């Protein structure tokens, strides 16, 4: 039946949270830690690798001229990117848009004061068992990153670098959540535990 069917005459829908809700909460959390938090976009779409390069460029601009935020800063974005499998990748590896985003961002970073995490808020990134990953300029070698991107095997690469973020299924989905952290005091490599975090039971009352 369509929305005009009598069965839905007294039905109503309420949106409890969306991507902007998550970004706003993340911004408030960053501000409590002393960061200048800026939401740069709520609806990033398109190629994950392109978005990764663009976010890395924002980070470099933040370091060099203090725009669009002055360090220590956190640049946040939401939306959902995609990965287009190339013809050369007949048997793609394990990965997803969030893993591809951070690997591509890591390749483009020059400053060691930038850390880039990206997660899917439902806890599952593409074909992997992780929510996403986290990198800085030193997490991955250029050669390994380029090989993984060519095979779309980015989650495997991040796992080898102890740079996957695993939460388990979260019971919700408000798109992706990306944070570009610009702070001389942060380091990404080896900072994320490989142990899953217990996700809340969506049926719990």
Which ranges hold each PLM region?
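Internal helix-turn-beta structural module
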Residues: 91-204
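Accessory alpha-helical/coil subdomains and C-terminal extensions
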Residues: 1-39, 44-52
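Conserved mixed alpha/beta catalytic, RNA-binding, or beta-rich assembly cores of soluble enzyme
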Residues: 54-61, 71-109, 113
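Structural signal for hydrophobic packing residues in well-ordered secondary-structure cores
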Residues: 26-37, 55, 59-67, 109-110, ...
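Active-site proximal loops enriched in glycine and acidic residues that flank catalytic Cys/His/Asp
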Residues: 39-44, 77-79, 85-87, 118-120, ...
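Flexible, glycine/charged-enriched surface loops at secondary-structure junctions
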Residues: 1, 34-43, 64-74, 112-119
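Flexible loop/turn segments at secondary-structure boundaries
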Residues: 47-48, 83-85, 123-127
């Amino acid at each position: 039946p369509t929305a005009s069917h009598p069965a839905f005459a007294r039905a109503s829908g309420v949106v409890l949270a969306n991507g902007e809700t998550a970004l706003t909460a993340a911004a408030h959390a960053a501000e409590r830690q002393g960061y200048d938090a800026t939401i740069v976009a709520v609806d990033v779409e398109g190629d994950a690798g392109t978005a990764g390069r663009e976010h890395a460029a924002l980070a470099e601009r933040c370091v060099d001229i203090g725009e669009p935020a002055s360090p220590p800063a956190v640049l946040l974005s939401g939306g959902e990117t995609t990965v287009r499998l190339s013809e050369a990748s007949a048997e793609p590896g394990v990965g997803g848009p969030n893993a591809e985003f951070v690997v591509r961002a890591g390749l483009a970073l020059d400053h060691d004061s930038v850390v880039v995490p990206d997660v899917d808020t439902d806890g599952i990134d593409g074909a992997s068992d992780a929510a996403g990953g986290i990198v800085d300029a030193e997490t991955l070698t250029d050669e390994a990153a380029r090989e993984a991107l060519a095979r779309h095997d980015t989650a495997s690469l991040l796992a080898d670098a102890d740079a996957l973020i695993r939460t388990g299924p979260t019971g919700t989905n408000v798109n992706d959540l990306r944070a570009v952290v610009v702070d001389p005091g942060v380091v990404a490599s080896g900072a994320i535990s490989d142990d899953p975090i217990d996700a809340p039971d969506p049926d719990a009352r």
